[in-house]
Amino acid sequence: MRKLFLLSILMIGVIVAFAGCVEESKTTTQLQQTTQSESQKAETQPKLGVNVVRYAETFKLYPHWDEGYCVVADSVGNKFVLVEGNAKAPNISDGKIIKVPVKRIVTDFYCPIISAADILNAYHHTIVGAPKYAVEKSPKLKELFDEGKVVDIGSPSKGVNYELIVNLTPDIVFLGDWKSEDVVEEKLKELGVTVSRFYTYQEPTYMGRVEWIKFAAAFWGSNAYKKADKWFENVVKVRENILKKVQNVTNEPTVVIFSWSKTKNMPGIYGNDSYYSKMIAEFKGKNVFDDYNRGYQYVDKETFYERAMNADVVILIWFYGDVKTKEDLLKINPNFAEFKAFKTGRFYVSHPDYYVWEARDPAGYMMDFAKMIHPELFGGDDDLKYYYKIK
């Protein structure tokens, strides 16, 4: 009886061990199949490669033009696979395939799409819709507008004509970073329209903002991209030459850069997070508001006057009209007469269309800043292109 009992226990142990081996074998097989499946999936998902963006932080770019495509990721992570000609589209997960060069573009701002077309002096015919104010900043696009080939789509702040946009059958619509544009994006997606977001004004550096030309040009194909890349490298060289000239500066002038609100009647300053402040620091100037971390913010007049009154250089960003003389400037605020920079001839005011040229001619725009901060190193400040020296 005892032997029978022991034999039964032994048989049960063998059965359990066998079952365990079977289950382990099954699990191993499943794991191998899963690993193989993931491996096969990885093989069908081409590697994006290297993000070639050098300065910008709000978009990514993976060019594979030799294989007929380029992958871009916009400011909110939307991924687009730009396929040229008859090239085979790669299988990029969550990537929207778009044939390039695109034929029908809608944009709600001047930069970076319209500015890129102006810089490259081409591709305006692909822009079929834009706000009228942006159209008027581009001579060629204005010409097409007058011919009825470009239409005014409205603007996020005043209202967008959704029906008109849909009827334009755009390949893609480009929107900026305003909160009102979040609503526009949601509505357009509901209508089945492809949308991309560009946060150019959130770039922490000026060169990062300028580099967006590569993003825009990629939608027009490899030739446009290569021209944009070459143009950008020339801008890089201008910046490097400026940095070389100021590298030995030890006496940094104090600088104020601000705007003045006509509606609020108060100053708004550009703090340490703005690309203006970073450019001033690079060119060996000292922004007196660099302890304000936000890019742009309003400050009370008392605080502003306390810091700005004795600054060596004062730069006013102004878009309400031309301000060329002391008389023009004092109409904005008579207290400016007490500023040190006003008395010494170091008070400067932007042209009202400055934002067009900081996108279209960054080399000239940077040189203006270099001359305003260190005129002694750059041949004086009497020949500025996009700022008025107040006299």
From Swiss-Prot:
Any idea which UniProt keywords this protein has? Cell membrane, Lipoprotein, Membrane, Signal
User: Which PROSITE patterns does the UniProt record give?
Assistant: FE_B12_PBP, PROKAR_LIPOPROTEIN
Which cellular component, as a GO term, is one annotated location? Answer: plasma membrane
How the protein sits in the membrane? Lipid-anchor
Q: What parts of the sequence cross the membrane? A: none
Where is this gene product found? Cell membrane
**Lipid attachment in record (S-archaeol cysteine):** 21
Pfam families attached to this UniProt entry: Peripla_BP_2 (PF01497)
**What sequence ranges are listed for the domain Fe/B12 periplasmic-binding?**
104-377
For this protein, the record's InterPro entries field holds: ABC_Transporter_SBP, ABC_transptr_periplasmic_BD
Range of residues in the leader sequence: 1-20
Q: What is this protein called?
A: Uncharacterized lipoprotein MJ0872
| Organism (species) | Methanocaldococcus jannaschii (strain ATCC 43067 / DSM 2661 / JAL-1 / JCM 10045 / NBRC 100440)
Cite the source lineage: Archaea, Methanobacteriati, Methanobacteriota, Methanomada group, Methanococci
